[in-house]
Amino acid sequence: MSVYSKLPSQLKKPLVKKAVVLLIALYGVKKLSPYFFGKLKGRTSKQVKGADPLTSNGEPLVEAARKRKRSPAVNREFFDRLIRLLKILFPRLFCKELGLLGFHSLALISRTFLSIYVANLDGQIVKTIVKKDPRAFVVELTKWLLIAIPATFVNSAIRYLEGQLTLAFRTRLVTHAYMLYFSDQTYYRVSNMDGRLANPDQSLTEDVVMFAASVAHLYSNLTKPILDVVVTCYTLIKTAESKGANTTWPSVIAGIVVALTAKVLRAFSPRFGKLVAEEARRKGDLRYMHSRIIANSEEIAFYGGHKIEMLQLQRSYNSLSRQINLILFKRLWYVMLEQFLMKYLWSASGLVMVAVPIITATGYSKYDSEDVKQAALDMKEEDLVSERTQAFTTARSLLNAAADAVERIMVSYKEVTELAGYTARVYEMFEVFEDVRDGVYRRSATEVKPEETGAPQNVTHGMRVEGPLQIRGQVIDVEQGIKCENLPIITPTGDVVVSSLNMQVDEGMHLLITGPNGCGKSSLFRILSGLWPVYSGVLYKPSPDHMFYIPQRPYMSVGTLRDQVIYPHSVQEMQEKGITDRQLEEILQTVSLRYILEREGGWDAVSDWKDVLSGGEKQRMGMARMFYHKPQYALLDECTSAVSIDVEGKIFEAAKDAGISLLSITHRPSLWKYHSHLLQFDGEGGWRFEKLDASTRISLQDEKIRLETQLSGIPKMQQRLTELCRILGEDSSLPTPGDEEEDEEEDEKQTERDVQSAGKEKDLME
């Protein structure tokens, strides 16, 4: 009070005091606005201003800008993608999803009209309180309690139907995605041939769930609020007109406030779609890191690599944590602005919008009769007070409902931007699946112009094809034989291993494939199996049903012991084929696995077979599958490397007796006698296809002995060279073993293994 008394008398006037307060407020806004807007917009301008020609991760700014341009946003591309996905959610006019949507819409409409009825009841209850009419109060309160029963049921039904709609959408998307994912070996090619989809498991699970939930929730958050706004505004206007109130100014105020709020929120809204899409991507990276550690836990434990793996895992988690913090920070300022506009500014505007009609109301409409007008003029003051109180309570309840609806509509824009992120990820998943199914592969997510596409007509060994690989070759299914005409072997990364391969394997021929590591042996099997495409040339081969591939590490499926033998058939398919358990037992006897049946407890025993069976047992189980399916051609990729020589010979002899043509990759000379032809790669893009007769075996054996003789002195010579370098204090001009490439080390290890096994197997060679 002492400070106030010392102010000049001019400042004590109400009008002057208001002007001073307004000036102080404007000055504060002027000083704080740069800080506020700077926080709201983030650090974008700073990053662009101080950016280097390369981004922090080495990415060119042009490419980074192009990626930002393609980031999810609410634009025409978003609506086009959403429409295509909605066609998957609603495949036909009469479907389950459309029926659920109809019931959901009916529940939302019912809730709107119940809200209007409850608002009128609120006004009636307040009127009875003002009039001090206890009997009427009890009657109106009873109505209010009775209407609560259907109202609560409708509220619960809305949530239930929204959950059912989310589940139906998810089921429809998952079904469609699985059909694409498991058609034409897409599940393999999307990870090994195409580089656009980093984490298919993330897209198939979490992204689909978030998209389905977002669509269902957004429908509720848009349909009901829009209906609420239309119905409540119509009710308010009709009520005001019936009492002769002014409806022009409230409508103008409402329009200005809503338009201003929408403009401000739109201007300062962060790009939630881009932020959410990036968060989902980083979640997928973190999940991949965890699954990678689980899949390679034994190797990591042998190396003692837990520290580096923990650092990589923490780095991935910290990346996700930074993204979540960024989203929370941007939401902090956005929600603050949103609450100020929608809670305080709208509340003040609502009071004005309610007060103006009540103050200007005459109590009758211009269309009313003279008797009604006179009755309104003759109404007692206490009745007028109760009528005004009822009108104020009803109008304010309806106006609050309308304001809440408008707020939800405007807040839904943030949800729409988040939906744009989920839509982009799900749409891109389907796009990649469809492209891969149609043979269109991209090794990165970057855009490439059509004229920059790769796979030229003429390729040479050692070159790398840049850009998307175009498939110009032909694959022709034939009844018998395998024939390659000018067939190149090109890896998914574009490396040309063999420029042109020409060979023919007729029925009854048994082909042995040899060569150093990385020369294209397994790559040829991938092409024959249809995993890799034929980029040029012509490949004649039987249908996939007549070819069976057995890798070095056979896959053990989830199921019974019987399921391991008949994989990938089911029990029903086995029965349709006419195979009995007795015949399966004979197959196990052929591969020396009969004891497994007794050890594991019969055909119906269920175990984690990849851990229960040893390496040799798993390889013999893979050969058992070959005898079950009885293909025309068996592609054997070192599939008996862990099997003893005697059992291996027994299995190969039985396969030949069964009429199965063998195409074998092996380093064991003991298997040469089971093959009639040889395909030898030299590792430099060259190859040799010839009949494997006695002279060929002798020449190969002579070459082997010569190499053994040359290699036997290498350790001593290397040791002597090291001693001389140490005495002279000089370094050797030859590369040390530690500097050799990884594939060369593997070649030496394989050669040493061949040398060690040569003596043991020499007596078995013909």
From Swiss-Prot:
GO terms for biological process: adrenal gland development; cholesterol transport; fatty acid beta-oxidation; long-chain fatty acid import into peroxisome; motor behavior; oligodendrocyte development; peroxisome organization; positive regulation of myelination. It is found in: Peroxisome membrane. The keyword Protein transport does not apply. Residues 482-708 form the ABC transporter domain. GO terms for cellular component: peroxisomal membrane; peroxisome. Keywords: ATP-binding, Hydrolase, Membrane, Nucleotide-binding, Peroxisome, Translocase, Transmembrane, Transmembrane helix, Transport. ATP binds at G515, P516, N517, G518, C519, G520, K521, S522. Residues 750-766 have a biased composition (Basic and acidic residues). Disulfide bonds: none annotated. It holds the Pfam family ABC_membrane_2. It is a multi-pass membrane protein. Its EC number is 3.1.2.-, 7.6.2.-. Disruption phenotype: abcd1 deficient zebrafish appear normal. By day of life five abcd1 mutants demonstrate impaired motor function, and overall survival to adulthood of heterozygous and homozygous mutants is decreased. Residues 738-749 have a biased composition (Acidic residues). It catalyses: a very long-chain fatty acyl-CoA + H2O = a very long-chain fatty acid + CoA + H(+); a very long-chain fatty acid(in) + ATP + H2O = a very long-chain fatty acid(out) + ADP + phosphate + H(+). ATP-dependent transporter of the ATP-binding cassette (ABC) family involved in the transport of very long chain fatty acid (VLCFA)-CoA from the cytosol to the peroxisome lumen. Coupled to the ATP-dependent transporter activity also has a fatty acyl-CoA thioesterase activity (ACOT) and hydrolyzes VLCFA-CoA into VLCFA prior their ATP-dependent transport into peroxisomes, the ACOT activity is essential during this transport process. Belongs to the ABC transporter superfamily. ABCD family. Peroxisomal fatty acyl CoA transporter (TC 3.A.1.203) subfamily. This is ATP-binding cassette sub-family D member 1. It comes from Danio rerio. The lineage of its organism: Eukaryota, Metazoa, Chordata, Craniata, Vertebrata. The gene is abcd1.
